[in-house]
Amino acid sequence: EALGLNKVKNPVTCGYLEMYNNKDKITLPVKMDSRFLIGPEGAHLNISGISGLAAKTSYAMFLLKAIQDKCYEADSEDDVAFVFFNVKGKDLLAIDQPAEFDNESDKERVYGQYTKLGLTTLPFKNVHYYYPYSAKKVGNTYLSKEAYNEQRINGNAKLYKYDCEDDMKKLDMLFASIEDPNQTMDSIINYIANEQGNFRGLDDWADFLEVVKENCQAGKKNDEISVGSWRKFNRVIRNSIYNNPMFGRIADDNEQTRLEDSLKHIKKNEVHVIDIAKLNEDMQGFVFGDAIR
């Protein structure tokens, strides 16, 4: 009571304190006002710690799981949805599976702590995974083929791709880190987004690259954009799109999807995990920007 831990409004568990009364150890659950995490007062949460130990990631996942538990309570009027980005290895690609323990005593100890904190010992619920499309039919991921197939059979894994007809207007995100002092790249991107010239009606990336190449030819006249600018644009685009299986038509097989289509139908208490761990830095930025936009 002296710490005010019993007076927190909209409480969500964020950890516990161990204190001693003489020789007796007392464990006190610590709760914070959930509005400062996910409500109208929400802001960034800073978690500090030693790099390489996965401690910061583990605590972030603990806190997010506590939030989902709170929103799943029968009398809760709150709901929340999560979008995670898996950026290293396969750390976040099995969060719907029970945790593994080295021995039974560790399991009992950890589960006991969760119970004292008023949390369930169940993994995340309503989890959906998205992997970069690959010609290998498994996805460009660190996840094993067996694990991916199990997720696919369970109906919670899809391969994401970018379709020319629908995603041609998103190419500006590939130039986020490209210096463009004269805004010539912006001019080209707007030219394409407005389907000017021969960009109208394109539905295939190979045709798109061919039209870009045509604009790079010497003597090609464009009142607004120079050939040199088109050549710079072409270099960046070809490095990202050419022979990249992520850029292609979406097959009508319920296994391939556009991230935009999946995320705009996100439902309450769902968890969507987007794997970008094996993508290069530019493509990671592109996928992240697409999801956030």
PLM region spans:
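Glycine-rich phosphate-binding loop of nucleotide-binding enzymes
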Residues: 22-123, 128
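N-terminal pre-Walker A segment at the start of P-loop NTPase domains
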Residues: 2-36
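P-loop NTPase motor domains
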Residues: 71-77, 85, 89-94, 121-293
